Amino acid sequence: MIIESLFSSKNYQASKKLLDAATLRHEGLATNLANVETPGYKRVDLPKTFAAEFAARMRAGTIATAAMPKLTEDLAATSQRKDGNNVELDKELLALGKNVSEYDTLTEFVSGSLKQLRMAITGRTT
């Protein structure tokens, strides 16, 4: 019963989904960085609507059934370069740093939840 309640809690489910999304975003940002000098390359990222849609699902309590987002071409990104590549190294590095920080925070939350479960099962704190 305790185990079921932990893994079915809204916060835990949301954290898992956000970890998956952060992993996917990291892959996209890494791809952007790898293609910073590729002529014609267009940056990819999670859809701009992802955060709002995720928040709406949280409020509605339907986060467990949310589909995993897909990386999409960032149509809002403009190119200042003649070769058509719209990746800006500074912006990508900032986005990557922010994404890593968010991932670390989520990992700490999930890890803390699992530590509480282990403590409840074993009765020990270590």
Model region roles, listed by residue range:
Residues 1-126:
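Amphipathic alpha-helical polymerization modules
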